[in-house]
């Protein structure tokens, strides 16, 4: 079989590997979807309402119990796993392509646990898991089709983007993510490989995963005053996003992996569980918090709520949990943009709260991901907004980018 594969034209082998990756990561997206729903159903019951109602109907004691048990199980799992295997990040897998292969089953279980803890209410993102499984699959396909090391690295990067696309149904944004965050060189070949894999993965997963935009909000329009709003939000939200990014990076660097994880991570989950007894809004990856604001509902003590949400993400990641920061960043950006818009109203400047939330989310995402173009595409894709909003979003991310560059040069 391998001899036959090697006999094929190299370009055809690369094409087949890319198509196989798109189909495979689409199936990964479906698996993540069912795993998340299965854990949520097991933990909180089969409720057909929205996610916040799901948490509410479970009751405070059940929320506390689920998070407490999840903390113990997650701590034991990651302690045992990391004693036996080294978890390789996506960037590390790209760097080591052809030299060292990650332990497939260990990394697969590692990704599954990330989805499971989010389903149980952990305050982190789930997006890391499909990206990591996508890179695993890409590495195996690159070897199976006897690709050169250069193309294997490209395929692994494509796997990360395709995994993200399958779960969130945002193929174009996921393609930009590969170029901006993984440093893939811009070329026609790379563009073709990336977009082929992301769009195919999205198409394969769509019948199961797609239920409309992830976040529901009315169509937003912009006017001349939107330019002022974009500049103000970029100036005021970027520093908060820089602070959150710094916390998240520190948590990743200092993440507990030794025996202390066995008490520290369960304790972190108990802190979250104690808050969730009274405030289920803190549970999950931030989707509940963001959707409440996007639905024009108010949240009492919003500044405190955002601060606590950000600290909970740090607390879990620092004490041994793994998970993403993309969706928490989006939620924090939604809240920050809304706050800035309200602040302007107090001083007599009346601006559109809905646009303010989108601007805040884009600025926050662009800063934490260090990927402004990806942030614009994700904000539009997540909320189903029209491309006409690109103009104020570009202005906001441009101003935010200048602030970030000046900050990093200090």
Per-segment meaning from a language model:
Residues 1-410:
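Alpha-helical transmembrane segments and immediately membrane-proximal extracytoplasmic
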